[in-house]
């Protein structure tokens, strides 16, 4: 057992690894609040280089993708039952510092809303931040601790 705060303990799963196969998760699909799904999708497609896979504002939800990154854009009526009001921030993990810089230049050239330029941070990430039309933030980064 591993002790946690206030005497709470969890079992030592390392001993059971020979018999338990951990479930592998696919990449998460963030839900991005949008005041208008069609306008938001237009920005993600025309400015940020995503593809509209399905949906529209009438249905309240749209799926977009770029490579292995998938996002859902949702309007207020779609979200009202559980209160995801936004804006939110999500992280986009790239494969190298060069990719971070390349994407920054691509988005800057396309007139994306850039919040901060690429910079090596003390926490060992190279990152920049962009925003969408509803001020949701996209933190683009590369973890260079082991590089």
Language-model features and meaning:
Residues 51-86, 137-142:
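Conserved short beta-strand elements that form part of the metal-binding/catalytic scaffold
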Residues 3, 7-41, 88-92, 143-147:
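N-terminal beta-strand motif that seeds the catalytic metal site of vicinal oxygen chelate
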